[in-house]
Amino acid sequence: MQIFHNLNEWIRFRNSLSPDLSLGFAPTMGNLHAGHASLFLASSKENHYTVSSLFVNPTQFNNPDDYKHYPRTVDADLELMTQNGVDFCILPNENEIYADGYAYQVQENRFGQLMEGKHRPGHFNGVLTIVMKLFNLVKPTRAYFGEKDYQQLLLIQGMVKALFMDIEIKSCPTVREKSGLACSSRNNRLTPSQREIADEFAKIFHQNKSSAMISKELEALGITVEYIEEFQGRRFAAVKIGDIRLIDNYLL
């Protein structure tokens, strides 16, 4: 795997590639897990080359403490990429990515204001802006995103369509642990006792009950429920176990 620490170096290399070659792209913030690996493998099966990026994007954290405590595990992340078909990895720094000081932003004013957008003001502005910047840098044929962040996936699909971007957005199924808990970088921050509660959250959330009944059962376990909502035939949830925030969704 070839690693690029400098954006100009990457741009020169990208421009040297034949336009006949397909590039798959799976952007990440690091602290990788099996869900990320599934994106890399899906890309490597469908493209000549697979590109990823490691960048903890400060503009999508509405809580500064979340950004501060987000695990940085670069060496392990690069190893996982190497083992799962990534050919090129971009490791940009914040000054390069936000040379404009975040003066220019991508904003969606409808669906992005619901659920995650309502509870994390500014979050999706940061997500869409960094994804747009990375798309312009990588110029991928296809880009891969997990269904765990389903609202994010829909917004990225919408952005690509609205702005006439010639990129195919591929959705990949949520990867889950044996307990049914969705793989997430945040899971690593759970204490053993919190982890048991998180496993119960996954089980209860997937029960065939009303959202109100599910909320009541979760709250009885000491879980803070931010929302459980249904949208376009899916059920979405965001909860807090201690100070660890977890999200999930599934098709009804």
Swiss-Prot record:
Record field: catalytic activity: (R)-pantoate + beta-alanine + ATP = (R)-pantothenate + AMP + diphosphate + H(+)
Documented EC number(s): 6.3.2.1
GO MF assignments: ATP binding; pantoate-beta-alanine ligase activity
Protein's name according to its UniProt entry: Pantothenate synthetase
Active site per UniProt: 36 (proton donor)
Subcellular location: Cytoplasm
Keywords: ATP-binding, Cytoplasm, Ligase, Nucleotide-binding, Pantothenate biosynthesis
Matching Gene3D superfamilies: HUPs, Pantoate-beta-alanine ligase, C-terminal domain
Similarity section: Belongs to the pantothenate synthetase family.
